[in-house]
């Protein structure tokens, strides 16, 4: 059975503005069903959505049993006002508002909390993020509150300091995880945090002509080196494509190939352990 631990049903892999516009009035069942059919045909039995504020992931969860798929969603991902994430998530101005938004997601049937606590990679410049991560104490409080409310936490997080803070708070999964150092890898391992590296968002950019090839190759190589180190430590890894992101179509199988390049012959055993942890936590 194939699994994808990070998708966005609201997006289509081509035009994020157009994709969101498609569902802005209400989730479009025809699109969602076609996408679920694709996953079913490819043998996917478990999907974990990264969330959206228009209810598309929520509707996909309702329809997924028709296709024999276990579907998990946070409903709306939560981000700090004025920082990365507001294009798809609900911005929050205070921790009090954060608690309110968690409550609203709970009423909508959320399975877990998704927080966005850093910027994203600049695919033209190796080592550069679009913005720094949130302060460590704030990250720790966001994770603590969600756990206190009974939810596991999925965190969009890049950069070593951001991931260290999240892992110290025992975040349940880290998504992306670009530019980590040994301290960050050890912190995730010790916390039992599952790393979902979404290599497809990098590897699928090669040869497209949109970004600097040298930078893309360097970013991918860095991520794969860190994955190998994390696996050697006994860290938990799970496959997630970030399907719906540009050049990452729904049903993409590239993640398994890219993880295999990094992890070698142990890839299946390593991913089985990580997937078991994801399904237990989420």
What residue ranges belong to the model's regions?
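Histidine/acidic residue-rich metal-binding segments in metalloenzymes
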Residues: 96-116, 122-195, 216-237, 269
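Histidine/acidic-residue-rich catalytic or RNA/ligand-binding cores of hydrolases
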Residues: 13-17, 163-169, 202-213, 223, ...
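Acidic/histidine-rich helix-loop elements
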Residues: 10-26, 81-92, 124-132, 206-215
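Glycine-rich anion/phosphate-binding loops
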Residues: 52, 90-100
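Active-site environment of divalent metal-dependent phosphoester hydrolases
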Residues: 8-12, 53-57, 79-81, 119-123, ...
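His/Asp/Glu-enriched, well-ordered alpha-helical/loop segment
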Residues: 148, 220-282
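Divalent metal-dependent hydrolysis catalytic cores, especially in the metallo-beta-lactamase
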Residues: 29-58, 68-78, 110-124, 152, ...
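Metal-associated gating/positioning segment near the N- to mid-region
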Residues: 2-63, 84
């Amino acid at each position: 059975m194939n699994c994808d631990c990070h998708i966005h049903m609201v997006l289509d892999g081509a035009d994020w503005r157009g994709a969101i516009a498609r569902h802005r009035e209400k989730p479009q069942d025809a699109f969602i069903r076609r996408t679920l059919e694709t996953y079913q045909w490819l043998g996917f039995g478990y999907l974990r959505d990264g969330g959206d504020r228009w209810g598309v992931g929520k509707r996909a969860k309702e329809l997924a049993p028709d296709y024999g798929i276990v579907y998990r969603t946070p409903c709306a991902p939560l981000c700090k006002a004025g920082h990365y994430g507001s294009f798809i998530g609900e911005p929050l101005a205070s921790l009090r508002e954060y608690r309110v938004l968690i409550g609203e997601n709970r009423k909508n049937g959320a399975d877990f909390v998704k927080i966005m606590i850093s910027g994203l990679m600049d695919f033209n410049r190796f080592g550069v993020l679009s913005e720094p991560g949130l302060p460590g104490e704030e990250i720790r409080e966001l994770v603590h509150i969600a756990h206190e409310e009974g939810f596991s936490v999925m965190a969009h997080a890049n950069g070593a300091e951001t991931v260290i803070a999240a892992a110290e708070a025992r975040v349940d999964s880290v998504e992306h995880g670009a530019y980590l150092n040994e301290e960050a890898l050890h912190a995730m391992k010790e916390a039992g945090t599952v790393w979902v590296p979404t290599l497809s968002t990098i590897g699928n950019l090669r040869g497209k002509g949109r970004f600097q090839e040298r930078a893309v190759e360097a970013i991918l190589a860095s991520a794969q080196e860190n994955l190998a180190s994390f696996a050697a430590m006994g860290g938990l890894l799970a496959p997630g494509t970030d399907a719906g992101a540009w050049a990452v179509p729904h049903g993409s199988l590239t993640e398994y190939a890219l993880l295999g390049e990094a992890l070698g012959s142990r890839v299946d055993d390593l991913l089985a352990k990580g997937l078991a942890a994801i399904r237990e936590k989420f």
